[in-house]
Amino acid sequence: MTRVKRGNVARKRRNKILKLAKGFRGSHSRLFRTANQQVMKALRNAYRDRRKRKRDFRRLWIARINAASRLHGLSYSQLIGNLKKANVQLNRKMLAQLAVLDPVAFDQVVTVAAQTRR
């Protein structure tokens, strides 16, 4: 059987993993096997949480819009439904920003939605 010399390749592969594990505590940043496990777990969690972040922000925006719209006597679903009927093209992120940072502008948006209801 022929001899396979892969010292550089193996070392580079291990160093790549150890570089990714920089900042981990204890053996998780020093020993290849534990570092490899932790890097794989970290990458898996990062992949999952990039998707989860989108869901979490949407929930936050909806909660903020709902709270602000109920101050004006409309529920969230009524507000969104009436805005769609009125052809107002504001997404949930922009509505939540208006509700928090510019309540006067949000009042005007709610007024448009309330007039559409009638």
Swiss-Prot record:
PROSITE patterns, sorted: RIBOSOMAL_L20
An example molecular function term from Gene Ontology annotations: structural constituent of ribosome
GO BP: any one term: translation
Tagged with keyword Cell division: no
Keywords in alphabetical order: Ribonucleoprotein, Ribosomal protein, RNA-binding, rRNA-binding
Domain of life of the source: Bacteria
GO CC annotation: ribonucleoprotein complex; ribosome
Cross-referenced PANTHER family: 39S RIBOSOMAL PROTEIN L20 (PTHR10986)
Described function: Binds directly to 23S ribosomal RNA and is necessary for the in vitro assembly process of the 50S ribosomal subunit. It is not involved in the protein synthesizing functions of that subunit.
Family label: Belongs to the bacterial ribosomal protein bL20 family.
HAMAP family: Ribosomal_bL20 (MF_00382)
UniProt protein name: Large ribosomal subunit protein bL20
Species of provenance: Cyanothece sp. (strain PCC 7425 / ATCC 29141)
